[in-house]
Regions:
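N-terminal helical cap/lid subdomain that shapes the substrate entry/recognition surface
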Residues: 2-93, 100-101, 112-116
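A structural alpha-helix within SAM-dependent methyltransferase catalytic domains
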Residues: 96-99, 158
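Anion (oxyanion) recognition and catalysis
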Residues: 99-100, 182
């Protein structure tokens, strides 16, 4: 029986726009941004800020060095928020319904302070609630110090929340993340970015 629902943010709860993120960082002056950004797991300074190896300020300073001019926190935030295409209302409605039905909702996301400076405010859903209002717990890579698909990230959730993988469903759009979760015994679902997944999830839970 499924008791716990563990969701990814980008590509699941939030529809992402990789091309817009690339465009914005190019606009900021990062000429080789295509080799620095990935839809699932970042590398270099972009990976370091998502893994918590550098702070938001250190990221800002390094990106300023890369582009040859001083960038502000808001400049960096502007770039990262290029990923945010929309948070579909159907997804928010599904989260509310599932929480109301007694499921324990947990977020497990590779993310960074710039993205969270938006998501942890009421701007997340258009003015009524922040990301925190929809979940029992948030596991954010830059706070935990590890990124998916590393098994340590999943193990942190298992240990801290005292959950059993076989009683948990992990929903993520990244195939490598899904594979890592399966190896630990999680039930999984892998919708594509922007897919209308709530109905399929409800049907899966009803079985």
């Amino acid at each position: 029986m499924i008791k716990n629902l563990i969701f990814d943010l980008g590509g699941v709860i939030m529809t992402i726009d990789q091309n817009e993120a690339l465009r914005r960082f190019k606009e900021l002056g990062v000429a080789d941004i295509e080799r620095r950004l990935d839809p699932y797991t970042q590398t270099g300074i972009f990976g370091d800020v998502e893994e918590g190896k550098v702070t938001a300020e250190e990221f800002r300073a390094e990106l300023s060095r890369i582009v040859g001019r001083t960038l502000s926190f808001d400049d960096c935030k502007y770039g990262w928020l290029g990923y945010r295409k929309e948070v579909p209302q159907r997804n928010l409605d599904a989260l509310r319904r599932l929480r109301g039905e007694g499921y324990r909702l947990i977020l497990l996301s590779n993310t960074n302070p710039f993205m969270m400076s938006w998501a942890l405010t009421k701007d997340f859903d258009g003015g009524t609630g922040s990301l925190e209002d929809y979940f029992y717990a948030l596991y954010l890579s830059y706070r935990i110090g590890v990124m998916k698909p590393d098994a340590k990230f999943f193990q942190a959730v298992i240990d801290n929340e005292h959950i059993l993988p076989e009683e948990s469903l992990f929903v993520d759009d990244g195939p490598r993340n899904i594979e890592a979760a399966r190896k630990l015994g999680f039930n999984t679902m892998c919708p594509k970015n922007g897919e209308d997944w709530p109905q399929a999830l409800m049907e899966m839970l009803a079985k």
